[in-house]
UniProtKB/Swiss-Prot annotation:
This is C-type lectin domain family 5 member A. Induction: By TNF in bone-marrow derived macrophage colony-stimulating factor-dependent macrophages. Up-regulated during the differentiation of myeloid cell line 32Dcl3 into neutrophils. CDD domains: CLECT_NK_receptors_like. GO terms for cellular component: cell surface; cytosol; plasma membrane. Disulfide bonds join 101-185, 163-177. Signal peptide: none annotated.
Length: 190
């Protein structure tokens, strides 16, 4: 048997497998935006951008279909369990972050379930993001911006910080409201 031919054949097969793997991994990222006007949904086939404009009575691209049939989030917002979330790339103090969310018809995120906290922290990664949890200066109780009481634990709360971030440490962390961080806005999906 000619071992040189067998080894050459195996090398060609390995190169083809590696090449096909890279092709399958990166082809959708490079050529994923098609001009056919359809965005795949999670389990209901496709929803056309034209149908989205019919729902809202306008023909712009400021809203895009999400992965849940019949719901729409603004462009650059993420859909999760009936809500739309915006993760900022810029940083601002807490008040400016809250004001930005208000201009978008939303609020800072109210993270009132462990599942929602995990989802937001997974996306936040190593960055810290303001959420809608604060306490009035001099008070001990933390409240969500919808005025509901928070019953969990906040780290660093003894440092006289009155706002909260999530992200890097996977906990609720007290933070100065005057320091600039990224922020998460939340609204109901339409």
């Amino acid at each position: 048997m000619n071992w040189h031919m067998i080894i050459s054949g195996l090398i060609v097969v390995v190169i083809k497998v590696v090449g096909m793997t890279f092709f399958l991994l990166y082809f959708p990222q490079v050529f994923g935006k098609s001009n056919d006007g359809f965005v795949p949904t999670e389990s209901y086939g496709t929803t056309s951008v034209q149908n989205v404009s019919q729902i809202f009575g306008r023909n712009d691209e400021s809203t895009m279909p999400t992965r849940s049939y019949g719901t729409v989030c603004p462009r650059n917002w993420d859909f999760h369990q009936g809500k739309c979330f915006f993760f900022s790339f810029s940083e601002s103090p807490w008040k400016d972050s809250m004001d930005y969310c208000a201009t978008q018809g939303s609020t800072l995120a109210i993270v009132n379930t462990p599942e929602k906290l995990k989802y937001l922290q997974d996306i936040a990664g190593i960055e810290n993001y303001f959420i809608g949890l604060v306490r009035q200066p001099g008070e001990k109780k933390w409240r969500w911006i919808n005025n509901s009481v928070f019953n969990g634990n906040v780290t660093n709360q003894d440092q006289n910080f009155d706002c909260v971030t999530i992200g890097l440490t996977k906990t609720y962390d007290a933070a100065s409201c005057e320091v600039s961080y990224r922020w998460i806005c939340e609204m109901n999906a339409k």
